[in-house]
């Protein structure tokens, strides 16, 4: 059994652990920003293919104490890197730390790179080339106050890069964060879902994949395919089983709206290119005028955060109108708003039944749940 660490957006660790259990991972242990787990290589392959919330899966190589940079070099140079990947593979080293007393993480990165290359020279007579932008193999170094852990990345490009969304507007949500938010809403396939501010359609694309039981990694490749122990036949079987499980792309009760015609066109293009054209209804509409087509359902939206000059005032004027529209049209619906603007509930004039801290990268946000029961949410 190997040990791994699955990284995810902070606040979604509980949901990631549930996904890991579903693909057969064991010895689950959550921490800030991820989940430690154990499993064989088939579990690692399935995790990369199936997990909707993970950012990447790191394979644990070694952990050891350190006091200075040379301790880290000695730990790294003792590892049998040539057994893990070929010298022809390009290499990158990535270092992150919490409470690390060392002055320069860049120097740590350099020393680990030296250690890996020195080990290759000793064992193979040559060293791998360094590629910082799009490497074949990445060694990840994590430093705590007095311990160093070395990992090999099994994912490659971040797992939120599904290979689906092409057109985007402004700064779209990462797909794994959108998937995690959908999980937090409690939405189930078959239940009506509306995104009234759909942007380039990230929530819609993730919801369709969930509804069709489509593994999010089917349209991409992974770094584990470039490791020396890659079991191609086993991976082919896992991938084929996931493909066979997909449901046919038939119309779903999932709807997207946006006031911006450019966003509507981007969403339609992304759905079409993903093979989901006709599965989701997308129209240009103002949320303030939009009305649901069913008595119950889930609304999920990512309103603007108001980070640019003047937008704060615009949002302060918009939110009371949003509150009025929700009270008028959306009774019976559970409405979820993901935002970094913590003024939203007060200005909307509706009391959230739940507010969950989440992070969009480094930006602290909230997922506000507002249950629209007619006449019961008004603030006095």
Annotate each predicted stretch with a short phrase.
Residues 173-291, 308, 312-316:
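Conserved S-adenosyl-L-methionine
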Residues 150-184:
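SAM-dependent Rossmann-like transferase core, predominantly class I methyltransferases
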Residues 46, 51, 157-162, 166-167, ...:
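Flexible, glycine-/basic-rich loop-and-beta segments that form/coincide
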Residues 98-101, 157-158, 304-308:
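A short, flexible beta-alpha/helix-coil linker loop
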Residues 1-137, 380:
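Non-catalytic nucleic-acid substrate-recognition regions in nucleic-acid-modifying enzymes
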Residues 286-289, 293-380:
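C-terminal catalytic and target-recognition region of SAM-dependent MTase-like enzymes
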Residues 8, 258, 339:
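Short beta-strand/turn micro-motifs composed of small residues
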């Amino acid at each position: 059994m190997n040990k791994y660490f699955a990284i995810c957006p902070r606040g979604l660790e509980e949901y990631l652990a549930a996904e890991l259990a579903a693909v057969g991972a064991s010895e689950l242990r959550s921490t800030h920003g991820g989940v430690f787990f154990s499993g064989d290589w088939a579990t690692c392959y399935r995790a990369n293919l199936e997990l909707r919330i993970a950012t990447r899966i790191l394979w644990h190589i070694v952990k050891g104490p350190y006091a200075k940079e040379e301790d880290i070099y000695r730990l790294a140079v003792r590892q049998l890197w040539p057994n893990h990947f070929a010298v022809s593979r390009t290499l990158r080293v990535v270092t992150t730390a919490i409470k690390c007393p060392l002055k320069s993480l860049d120097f740590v990165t350099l020393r680990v790179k030296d250690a890996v290359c020195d080990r290759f020279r000793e064992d193979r007579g040559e060293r791998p080339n360094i590629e910082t932008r799009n490497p074949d193999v990445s060694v990840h170094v994590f430093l705590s106050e007095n311990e160093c852990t070395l990992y090999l990345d099994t994912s490659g490009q971040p797992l939120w890069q599904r290979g689906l969304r092409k057109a985007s507007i402004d700064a779209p949500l990462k797909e794994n964060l959108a998937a995690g938010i959908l999980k937090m809403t409690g939405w189930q396939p078959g239940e009506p879902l509306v995104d009234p501010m759909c942007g380039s359609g990230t929530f819609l694309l993730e919801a369709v994949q969930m509804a069709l039981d489509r593994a999010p990694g089917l349209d991409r490749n992974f770094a584990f395919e470039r490791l020396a122990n890659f079991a191609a036949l086993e991976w082919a079987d896992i991938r084929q089983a996931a493909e066979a499980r997909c449901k046919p792309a038939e119309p779903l009760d999932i709807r997207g709206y946006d006031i911006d015609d450019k966003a509507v066109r981007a969403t339609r293009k992304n759905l079409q290119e993903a093979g989901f054209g006709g599965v989701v209804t997308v129209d240009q509409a103002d949320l303030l005028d939009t009305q649901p087509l069913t008595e119950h359902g889930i609304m999920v939206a990512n309103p603007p955060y108001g980070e640019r000059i003047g937008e704060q005032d615009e949002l302060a004027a918009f939110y009371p109108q949003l509150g009025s529209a929700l009270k008028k049209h959306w009774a019976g619906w559970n409405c979820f708003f993901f935002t970094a603007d913590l003024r939203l509930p007060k200005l909307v004039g509706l009391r959230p039944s739940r507010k969950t801290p989440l992070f969009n990268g480094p930006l602290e946000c909230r997922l506000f749940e507002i249950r629209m029961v007619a006449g019961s949410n008004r603030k006095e």
